[in-house]
């Protein structure tokens, strides 16, 4: 921990990526970096110099909700899909802050709608793929897959999120 001057603080802020919870996030700057990158979208979303504060759960869940393979290169993500995932991140993360839990499951896949038991996990929310490796996908029934990416466990559905 160190004390920063105002200039030092501003200099550090320039190293931080775009935060979906900030109204002043520069989505155009983020798009420019994602659109040029050969790195996978799953990797890019864990890069705090690009996506500030997104983290592992929101990465896995947002990619699932949009049918995006975490292995798709950033440059192959369309602008329409990029905008849709950004908007979804904003909505999901704002909901998480307001409710103190991470819920990413759409109403039609809720425990009540599907007649299933609620998820029991330490983060306390309903999710599609996060920490569900080997369990059937709520949408298609394929077992959820898991692998390490960017030093974190990545979860995805191989059917709903087909490889590029």
Regions found by a protein language model. Give the residues of each.
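Short functional micro-motifs and their immediate structural scaffolds
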Residues: 144-145
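Residues immediately within or flanking Cys/His clusters that coordinate Zn2+
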Residues: 134, 154
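A broadly conserved sequence feature marking short terminus-proximal activation segments
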Residues: 72-131
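Short metal-binding segments enriched for Cys and/or His
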Residues: 163-164
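Short cysteine-rich clusters marking metal-coordination/redox-active sites
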Residues: 137-140, 157-160
């Amino acid at each position: 921990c160190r004390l920063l001057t105002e200039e030092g603080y501003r200099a550090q802020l320039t190293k931080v990526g775009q935060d979906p919870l900030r109204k002043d996030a520069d989505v155009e700057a983020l798009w420019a970096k994602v659109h040029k990158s050969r790195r996978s979208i799953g990797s890019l979303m864990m890069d705090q110099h690009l996506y500030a504060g997104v983290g592992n759960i929101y990465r896995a869940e947002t990619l699932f909700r949009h049918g995006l393979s975490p292995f798709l290169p950033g440059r192959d993500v369309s602008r329409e899909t990029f905008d849709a995932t950004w908007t979804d991140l904003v909505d999901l993360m704002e909901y998480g802050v307001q409710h103190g839990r991470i819920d990413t499951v759409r109403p039609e896949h809720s425990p009540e709608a599907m007649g299933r038991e609620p998820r029991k996990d330490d983060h306390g929310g309903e999710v599609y793929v996060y920490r569900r490796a080997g369990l059937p996908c709520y949408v298609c029934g394929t077992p959820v897959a898991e692998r390490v990416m960017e030093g974190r466990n990545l979860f995805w559905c191989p059917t709903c999120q087909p490889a590029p």
